[in-house]
Amino acid sequence: MCTGGCAKCLGSTLIPLALFGILANILLFFPGGRVIDNNDHLSEEVWFFGGILGSGVLMIFPALVFLGLRNNDCCGCCGNESCGKRFAMFTSTIFAVIGFLGAGYSFVISAISINRGPKCLMDNSTWGYPFHDGDYLNDEALWSKCLKPEDVVPWNLTLFSILLVVGAIQMLLCVIQVVNGLLGTLCGDCQCCGCCGGDGPV
């Protein structure tokens, strides 16, 4: 597969992942699937917008760049047949790094939240974090420490786990594009587009 075609494939995969991450983050604002009375009762990590900013917005821009590489005009560099696509592929590596950082941000926030557990109403009628160092992950009986919102533990655990997996996949795809982009920069794409009058390798 040409480097441009590979980039398009990666971009096509990143777009739905980004939308999935945004949706998961939005759902975290409704713990247990319910509207909460006081926003202060939401887990702090929800407000870091890991899925909306990290896996979402910061990933959409690289994905669009990757999608555009398939039809990139090789004459885009002062009419030079060889450097147009090479420059575009090099630029894509920069966007891939940005995407990697965004996905990494979402991944870290999700991991911290999973380990910390959700903010909820505890037995002493105060709102806080009843779990420590992810102890609730191996002992479902501890979930009863959270009185309200109902089902907040499985809700947060599921959504942050989704964001964790999405972030990991996005980071992997961005690393692949960095390698793909460097190969495209050094070796060129499979062939030059017809506008230059050349059909051979870049």
Tell me the role of every PLM-derived stretch.
Residues 2-123, 163-186, 191:
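Signature of small four-pass
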